[in-house]
């Protein structure tokens, strides 16, 4: 197993397009790191540079203590699992898993042992004689992972491995990959655009946009303490509610004035706005849907954060309900208990958890309070 280090790594294509910009990251041995971001943000390009499938334009990549910028992919001691499985259709599951070992001239008895061990880990033993066309999508993806496991690499790279699977299979395979990481204790770098995969699998998440790292943190910290507007909006579904608000300072308390409502902030958040000189300025106010309540208990205990709106859309998702409405001209979403009596057309009172309010600078989009 191995640690990785990327220092000032850049990728510039011949046409001048800068796909990855000054990428700096230290990955510890046995970490499960997720690269997440929208399409075209540079996450797969970064993974391919680590794999050696893309040249590094500038900067330094280390695997363990060795600089590998100019090392061939086959000599980096890594294994990659692709989105499209990349299985040989004419070979059996056994032969697909054994192929890389045969190329490396591993003894036949050792190949047999390694393939069968990997097959046992991934529950593929009954399928070893089958061809890929006789397998389901989830089984094919397990074969692709098995082919990587048998090599016993220092690092696993996974490029959107679950994106071709249906929703139910994706959940099953997420669990399988988590178990695999626990069992093998290996370093995994995993690329996805799916924030659910990122939040559930990663020990740390790297959020990217336009080739630039926005934030690197644990899933919980990313969700609760986003560093800017992009991270706050990208992580979480439904996404965070954003509204323009004007700061009005009264003594040592900062109020957010939104659509005629004045919401006093807690002392710690107030201090950051006051110290930052935001009195009278327009800021961006953010709050997650689960921190908007329609229950009487919250309405009674948080009277200063209460507002009224008319429900536009009601979505039932089993144990919870999404309520969609407007606050002034700003669209809002509340994630509430399924026992709510609110329905489209109803005028409903809502209360906010002021401790969970995020405030962002309107110009820089950086967080002011967390």
Task: List PLM regions with ranges.
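The feature captures the beta-strand-to-loop junction immediately N-terminal to the Walker
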Residues: 36-38
């Amino acid at each position: 197993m191995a640690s990785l280090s990327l220092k000032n790594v850049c990728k510039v294509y011949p046409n001048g397009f800068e796909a990855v910009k000054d990428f700096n990251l230290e990955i510890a041995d046995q970490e499960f790191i997720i690269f997440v971001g929208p399409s075209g943000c540079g996450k797969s390009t970064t993974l391919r540079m680590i794999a050696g499938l893309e040249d590094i334009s500038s900067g330094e990549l280390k695997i363990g203590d060795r600089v590998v910028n100019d090392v061939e992919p086959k000599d980096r001691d890594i294994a990659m699992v692709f989105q499209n499985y990349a299985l040989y259709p004419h070979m059996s599951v056994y032969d697909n898993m054994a192929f890389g070992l045969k190329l490396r001239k591993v003894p036949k008895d050792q190949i047999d042992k390694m393939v069968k061990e990997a097959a046992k880990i991934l529950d593929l033993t009954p399928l070893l004689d089958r061809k890929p066309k006789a397998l389901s999508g989830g089984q094919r993806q397990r074969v692709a992972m098995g082919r990587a496991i048998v090599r016993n690499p220092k690092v696993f790279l996974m490029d959107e491995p679950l994106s071709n699977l249906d929703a139910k299979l994706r959940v099953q395979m997420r669990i399988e990959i988590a178990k695999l990481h626990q069992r093998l204790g290996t370093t995994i770098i995993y690329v996805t655009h799916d924030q659910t995969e990122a939040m559930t699998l990663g020990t740390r998440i790297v959020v990217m946009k336009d080739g630039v790292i926005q934030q690197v943190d644990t899933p919980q910290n990313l969700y609760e303490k986003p560093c800017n507007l992009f991270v706050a909006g990208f992580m979480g579904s439904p996404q965070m509610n954003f509204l323009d608000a004007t700061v009005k300072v009264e003594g040592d308390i900062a109020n957010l004035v939104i659509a005629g409502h004045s919401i006093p902030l807690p002392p710690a958040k107030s201090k950051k706005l006051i110290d930052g000189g935001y009195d009278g300025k327009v800021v961006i106010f953010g709050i997650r849907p689960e921190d908007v309540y329609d229950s009487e208990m919250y309405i009674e205990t948080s009277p200063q954060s209460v507002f009224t709106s008319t429900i536009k859309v009601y979505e039932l998702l089993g144990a919870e309900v999404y309520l969609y409405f407007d606050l002034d001209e700003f669209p809002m979403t509340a994630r509430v208990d399924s026992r709510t009596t609110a329905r489209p057309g109803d005028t409903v009172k809502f209360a906010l958890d002021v401790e969970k309010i995020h405030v962002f600078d309107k110009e820089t989009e950086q967080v002011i309070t967390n």
